[in-house]
Amino acid sequence: MNPITDWTFYAVAVPAVLLLGISKSGFGAGFGSLAVPMMALVVTVPQAAAILMPVLLVMDLLGIAAFRKDFDRRLLAFLLPWGLLGIVVGTLSFRLLQPQWVAGIVGVFTLLFLAQRLLFPPRADGAPPPRWVGALLTATSGFTSFVAHAGGPPINAYVIPLRLSPVVFTGTMAFFFFVINLAKWLPYAWLGLLDWRNLATSLVLLPLAPLGVWIGVRIARRIDQQLFYRFVYLGMLLTGVKLLWDAVA
């Protein structure tokens, strides 16, 4: 098992993994979707996704440990079946899709959601999104998570309007993405995306996982709710622009 040794790969992969860890803690949620596009500067998108798989699972476990009492059980029970459905769709269509197409769709959707939130801010007493919207967005999250580890923007578009506290938001997302990422292992292996070289490279990057999550957890537990969601929006903005750029470049 010989990992990647090219220093240019690690010059990009190290900050990408740290950014992913900070995002997994809940602080700056949405920034994590930049990890695969960043690593795609030095390796292919499928290889970047495969390398990040074990790292993501460790980060999810750390997030669950940090927020194990802070999650919405009823919301999670609603989200998980739809997210898993998205993985099934992603598995069946993976070889038919160009990653650029998916990146473009997610990028446009993310920017439209942000524009709607900024131009028409929700009222404090406004009704939450209907459940059919949640089902559609969560299935989309499972799909985009499978093909590009970019599941954050779609599910954020549903969960953010629910106005959860930062801690409950973070805990719920940690549990959701742990199940989603765990469910991706078998399809990834079936599609031939996992190999010993990628797994060895994952082991090299693994020590960065707790560092990124630790930084994000400390910030998330101390930040004001309004400021927290501003960082979420900023992360989604950068993600949307980068994904759209990847689609047209």
Q: Where are each of the predicted segments found?
A:
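Transmembrane helix exit motif
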Residues: 60-70, 105-130, 217-218, 238-249
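Residue-level recognition of pore/gate-forming positions within transmembrane alpha-helices
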Residues: 56, 83-87, 110, 177, ...
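Small-residue-mediated transmembrane helix hinge/kink sites in multi-pass secondary transporters
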Residues: 37, 91-95, 157, 217
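Cytoplasmic-side transmembrane-helix entry/capping segments in multi-pass membrane proteins
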Residues: 72-83, 104-107, 128-138, 168-174, ...
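Hydrophobic alpha-helical transmembrane segments in multi-pass integral membrane proteins
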Residues: 48, 89, 93-94, 99, ...
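Glycine/small-residue-rich loop that forms an oxyanion/phosphate-binding "nest" at active or ligand-binding sites
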Residues: 71-118
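Small-residue-rich hydrophobic segments that form or flank transmembrane alpha-helices
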Residues: 9-77, 137-142, 152-213
